[in-house]
Structures are given as structure tokens and as C-alpha cells.
């Protein structure tokens, strides 16, 4: 029994001595406080790294879950195009030349689209043909309600092609200048097209009217049999009546003109006028004018 007790006491003493040795080492060792270092302090940086990794993995899982839910809610396939090819080229140029000032959120705000659309544009390397560009731009502009601006894309300015045959023009194109210009900046172009069409349709009517006027003038200049004693009056009046009819007025000689003729030829001029059908003569038989 004594042996066992001595062994137990010896073991306790050794343990106490070892503890005292660790304590003395901790006191004598370098350190500002002089206390025993915490063994868990060596694991703090590793725990922080593990926590950061766990948080990043958690965020990634949440993002993946959000993407899955959004794909299920959205329609299948690519989203509808809302940008023209010119706008997409401008987005790529700005992001490539000025990446700091034109970031993805800034581009999305400037072009009024989502950030996903900007990322799709930046990732895409597809180069379509000119026909494909025009076709896709036409769809985009039709959805945006700007079909009239296709003339700027084609560069030809042939706006008459945009108006098919028999197309009824809306009332907004025929509004007064100030009101139409405030609502539609391209109303002048549409009015020009309409005016050109109406000019073409009215051209035959104008030609017929002019031909009729010329025919009337030719009939008015048909020589009339006058007395041989007065060729001078006939020649003079024909030259005088030619000037007002040449202007296209078609008016009859005024009273002032008749007074001038009377003053020039007082002997041969008579104030009495005789009507024979559509022709008018004086009392001496001289031809005056025709209706």
C-alpha cells in the first residue's frame, strides 16, 4: 500500500513540477505581458479564411439559385432585341476605349437597358451581313415606334418607298406647320412626298387648262374681214390686245384702254358699239374685241 501511495504522490508531484516549469518558462520567455500563450490563437487566421470561403460559396449558391428561378420565369430563348447595330458597336467602342468611365452599369443606364443586355453585347462576336443588319434594325425600330427613321439607315433619302400605293395618310401629317413640327420632326418629309404625288396627278389637268387657253388665244387672233379703209386700226388693236392676253389674264379691254384708243383716233372712232354674236364692232364697222 505504501508503494502505491508513494507512486501516486510521485506522479502528482511530477505533474506539478512540470506545470511549474511551463509557468516559469512563460514568465521568463519573451513577451510584453508574460502570460501563457493561448494555443487557439494560431488558428484564428485559418478560421477567418474558412469563413470567407464559406461566405463566397454561399453567395455563389444563392446566385445560381436566382439564375435558375429567373430562367424558369422568363420566356425561353434569347431576349428580344432592343438595340440597333450602331448602338451595339458604340457600346463596344466605349467599353473598350474608356473602361473606367463607361462600366457595365453606366452603359446600361446610358442606353436604357439592363446590365444583362450590355454583357451579352460585350460577349457577342457575331458579325452579320448588311442585309441582316437592316432587317434587324427595322424590327427594333418598328417595336420602338420609329419606323420613319429608316431613311437615315439606308442613307438614300427615298422616303417615297416607305409609303406603299394606296396608303392612307393620317391626319397628323396634314396638321399646321408648328403643331406638326412639335409632334413629329419628320413631318416635312412626309408632306413633301404627298405634295410631289399630288403634283404628278394634277399635271395632266394643268396641261389641259393651258392647252385650252392657248386655243382660245389662237381663236381670238383669227383675222376678221374689216373695211379696206381702216387696216391701221385693226393692226394697232391686234397688237394692243395681244399684250394683255399674252399675260394669261384673259380680261376684256378696260374703259381706260378704250379711252386711249378714242383719243388716238378721234375721226375714225365712234362711241357706239355694235354686237354681232361674240364679236363687237364700232359704228364704222371696225372690230373691237371678241368674248
Curated annotation (Swiss-Prot):
Residues 26-48, 155-270 are annotated as: Disordered. GO terms for molecular function: RNA binding; rRNA binding. The keyword Manganese does not apply. It is found in: Nucleus; Secreted; Mitochondrion membrane. Keywords: Developmental protein, Differentiation, Glycoprotein, Membrane, Mitochondrion, Nucleus, Phosphoprotein, Secreted, Signal. Expressed at high levels in heart, brain and skeletal muscle. In brain, mainly expressed in neurons rather than glial cells. Its main location: nucleus. One of its GO terms (cellular component) is extracellular region. One of its GO terms (biological process) is positive regulation of mitochondrial translation. Pfam families: Neugrin (PF06413). The modification Phosphoserine is found at residue 41. Forms a regulatory protein-RNA complex, consisting of RCC1L, NGRN, RPUSD3, RPUSD4, TRUB2, FASTKD2 and 16S mt-rRNA. Interacts with 16S mt-rRNA; this interaction is direct. Belongs to the neugrin family. Plays an essential role in mitochondrial ribosome biogenesis. As a component of a functional protein-RNA module, consisting of RCC1L, NGRN, RPUSD3, RPUSD4, TRUB2, FASTKD2 and 16S mitochondrial ribosomal RNA (16S mt-rRNA), controls 16S mt-rRNA abundance and is required for intra-mitochondrial translation of core subunits of the oxidative phosphorylation system. This is Neugrin. The lineage of its organism: Eukaryota, Metazoa, Chordata, Craniata, Vertebrata. The gene is NGRN.
Amino acid at each position: 500500500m505504501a508503494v502505491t501511495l508513494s507512486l501516486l504522490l510521485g506522479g502528482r508531484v511530477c505533474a506539478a513540477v512540470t506545470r511549474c516549469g511551463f509557468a516559469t518558462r512563460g514568465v521568463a520567455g519573451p513577451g510584453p505581458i508574460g502570460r501563457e500563450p493561448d494555443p487557439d490563437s494560431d488558428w484564428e487566421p485559418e478560421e477567418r479564411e474558412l469563413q470567407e470561403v464559406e461566405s463566397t460559396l454561399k453567395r455563389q449558391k444563392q446566385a445560381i439559385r436566382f439564375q435558375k428561378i429567373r430562367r424558369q420565369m422568363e420566356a425561353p430563348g434569347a431576349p428580344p432585341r432592343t438595340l440597333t447595330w450602331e448602338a451595339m458597336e458604340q457600346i463596344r467602342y466605349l467599353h473598350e476605349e474608356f473602361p473606367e468611365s463607361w462600366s457595365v452599369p453606366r452603359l446600361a443606364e446610358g442606353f436604357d437597358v439592363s446590365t444583362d443586355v450590355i454583357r451579352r453585347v460585350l460577349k457577342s462576336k457575331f458579325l452579320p451581313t448588311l442585309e441582316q443588319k437592316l432587317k434587324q434594325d427595322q424590327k427594333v425600330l418598328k417595336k420602338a415606334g420609329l419606323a420613319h427613321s429608316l431613311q437615315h439607315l439606308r442613307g438614300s433619302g427615298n422616303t417615297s418607298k416607305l409609303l406603299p400605293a394606296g396608303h392612307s395618310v393620317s391626319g397628323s401629317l396634314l396638321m399646321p406647320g408648328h403643331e406638326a413640327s412639335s409632334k413629329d420632326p419628320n413631318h416635312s418629309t412626309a408632306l413633301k412626298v404627298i405634295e410631289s404625288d399630288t403634283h404628278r396627278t394634277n399635271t395632266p389637268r394643268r396641261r389641259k387648262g393651258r392647252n385650252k387657253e392657248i386655243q382660245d388665244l389662237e381663236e381670238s387672233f383669227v383675222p376678221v374681214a374689216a373695211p379696206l379703209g381702216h387696216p391701221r386700226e385693226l393692226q394697232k388693236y391686234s397688237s394692243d390686245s395681244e399684250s394683255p392676253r399674252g399675260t394669261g389674264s384673259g380680261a376684256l379691254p378696260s374703259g381706260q384702254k378704250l379711252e386711249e384708243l378714242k383719243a388716238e383716233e378721234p375721226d375714225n372712232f365712234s362711241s357706239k358699239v355694235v354686237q354681232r354674236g361674240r364679236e363687237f364692232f364700232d359704228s364704222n364697222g371696225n372690230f373691237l374685241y371678241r368674248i
